[in-house]
């Protein structure tokens, strides 16, 4: 039976109603600071924490509840005769319910221009200590950290005069989930202040649920989408859905791929993605022309794909997009007329991501879960260093070819390995993704390009192990190649390029993607 409840909350949602209901059941309310004032102002009788401890709050409120009369009252096992004897001897009363949520550390660090001292002041000490104590003694103490649990607990109390052990256990689990999340945010924030690139000895990650999904990558797989706290700049988690059905697992994965590619480009660009691989990418002087070129790059694969643009979608562009079926259109904004046109199709998802071109922050991790472990690396934010570009052939690329080579490298960087991208006039004309050997990827890209490969350039995400890709490129009329270099047979590829009059540039930077 609950006789005394300790309440101290930062999020005061529903707390007055909760306390009033508890008091109507004969429960004494103990409280601290601002919570005590809120409850008192609402006409609820409150016992101040200092009246329980016999010790005043001090150090600007830093020390309020860190006292044996609080923690012994929470931690005492009621069925343990020795525990109860000691409480009586020390004149300590039990505390049967603890309702606490912690200082708003997350909200503080997400504010603009927050400084370290303000963040530090919002690290809760007493709160985590009390809720962990209550959760440890869950068989005797009800602990609530989430206002959404108030109603269910009250319903049980009204119905049975008590709270079931099953409910207490569930609430205790939520405490450790809550404190783990809280401490991980603190550790992450402090690590970011140090600014070191070294990987920590232990890696704690915390994410918040965004939505349950109908299914995962396939219908027989369950799935949920979580977001990383504070990492929403230019990310899919920050996108605002303006129209259409709920995003699926595959939608989010593909949309993320499109966003990552579009970040590589400064001039008006449109990216079309299918199964996380680019199928059409083009840059132009305006977004309409960029879309037309991206569509014409591969009008078959774009069907049912994802489109991302780095400029506002206008009516003219929307009219063209509406001629085919696409799953998603992502852009920094849409004109009112464009929205009117695109929303004629009820199933198309329209996502607004205002800062779509924002670069991924330095220090961002790229992670891949494997059974029993986690692979972690720095995010691949680099493309190439212009100072490291090395022309290795007799023929040098023209300025136009060089611009197309860099364009193609931006695309192939985001193509599953082994990957090849062909481009001409800042438009992909063929992409060969995800092959187990490079020459097959090359042949696929050339097949997509058809007659357009004449005068095009080729980008490879890794070095050529043999000269066979150069042979295939020469036969297709390709005039320039960009690749990392680094093969023990580089000279064979260089000799082949010289034989066919192809310019070749080494970047010294590989871009595998798995």
Curated annotation (Swiss-Prot):
Q: Which UniProt keywords apply?
A: Hydrolase, Multifunctional enzyme, Purine biosynthesis, Transferase
Would you name any one GO CC term? cytosol
Q: In which pathway does it act?
A: Purine metabolism; IMP biosynthesis via de novo pathway; 5-formamido-1-(5-phospho-D-ribosyl)imidazole-4-carboxamide from 5-amino-1-(5-phospho-D-ribosyl)imidazole-4-carboxamide (10-formyl THF route): step 1/1; Purine metabolism; IMP biosynthesis via de novo pathway; IMP from 5-formamido-1-(5-phospho-D-ribosyl)imidazole-4-carboxamide: step 1/1
The record's section on PROSITE patterns has: MGS (PS51855)
Q: Name one GO biological process term.
A: 'de novo' IMP biosynthetic process
MGS-like domain mapped to chain residues: 1-145
Do the record's keywords include Membrane?
Answer: no
Q: What is this protein called?
A: Bifunctional purine biosynthesis protein PurH
Annotated source species? Acetivibrio thermocellus (strain ATCC 27405 / DSM 1237 / JCM 9322 / NBRC 103400 / NCIMB 10682 / NRRL B-4536 / VPI 7372)
């Amino acid at each position: 039976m609950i006789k005394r409840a300790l309440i101290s909350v930062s999020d005061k949602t529903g707390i007055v109603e909760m306390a009033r209901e508890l008091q109507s059941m004969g429960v004494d309310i103990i409280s601290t600071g601002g919570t005590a004032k809120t409850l008192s102002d609402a006409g609820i009788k409150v016992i101040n924490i200092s009246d329980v401890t016999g010790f005043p709050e001090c150090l600007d409120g830093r020390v309020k509840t860190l006292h044996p009369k609080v923690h012994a009252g929470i931690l005492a096992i009621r069925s343990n005769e020795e525990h109860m004897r000691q409480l009586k001897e020390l004149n300590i009363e039990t505390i049967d319910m603890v309702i606490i949520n912690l200082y708003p550390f997350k909200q503080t660090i997400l504010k603009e221009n927050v400084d370290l001292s303000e963040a530090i002041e919002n690290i809760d000490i007493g709160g985590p200590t009390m809720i962990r104590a209550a959760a440890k003694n869950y068989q005797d103490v009800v602990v609530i950290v989430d206002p959404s649990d108030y109603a269910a607990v009250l319903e049980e109390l009204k119905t049975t005069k008590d709270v079931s052990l099953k409910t207490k256990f569930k609430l205790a689990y939520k405490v450790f989930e809550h404190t783990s999340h809280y401490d991980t945010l603190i550790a992450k924030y402090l690590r970011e202040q140090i600014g070191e690139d070294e990987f920590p000895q232990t890696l704690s990650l915390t994410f918040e649920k965004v939505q349950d999904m109908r299914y995962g990558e396939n219908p027989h797989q369950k799935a949920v989408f979580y977001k990383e706290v504070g990492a929403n700049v230019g990310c899919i988690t920050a996108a605002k859905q303006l129209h259409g059905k709920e995003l699926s697992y595959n939608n989010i994965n593909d949309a993320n791929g499109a966003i990552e590619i579009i970040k590589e480009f400064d001039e008006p660009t449109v990216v079309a993605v299918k199964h996380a691989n680019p199928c059409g990418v083009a840059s132009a002087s305006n977004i309409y022309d960029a879309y037309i070129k991206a569509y014409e790059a591969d009008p078959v694969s774009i069907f049912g794909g994802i489109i991302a643009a780095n400029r506002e979608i206008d009516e003219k562009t929307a009219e063209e997009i509406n001629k085919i079926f696409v799953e998603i259109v992502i852009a920094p904004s849409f004109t009112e007329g464009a929205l009117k046109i695109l929303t004629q199709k009820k199933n198309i998802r329209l996502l607004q991501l205002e800062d779509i071109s924002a670069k991924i922050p330095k220090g961002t991790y790229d992670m891949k879960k494997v059974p029993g472990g986690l692979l972690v690396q720095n995010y691949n934010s680099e493309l190439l260093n212009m100072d490291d570009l090395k022309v290795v052939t007799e023929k040098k690329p023209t300025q136009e070819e060089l611009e197309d080579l860099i364009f193609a490298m931006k695309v192939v960087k985001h193509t599953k390995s082994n990957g090849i991208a062909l481009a001409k006039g800042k438009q992909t004309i063929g992409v060969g993704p995800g092959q187990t050997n490079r020459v097959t990827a090359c042949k696929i890209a050339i097949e997509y390009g058809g007659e357009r490969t004449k005068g095009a350039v080729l980008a490879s995400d890794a070095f050529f192990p043999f000269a066979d890709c150069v042979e295939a490129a020469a036969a297709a009329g390709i005039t320039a190649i960009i690749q990392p270099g680094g093969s023990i047979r580089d000279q064979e590829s260089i000799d082949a390029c010289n034989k066919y009059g192809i310019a070749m540039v080494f970047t010294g930077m590989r871009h595998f993607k798995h």
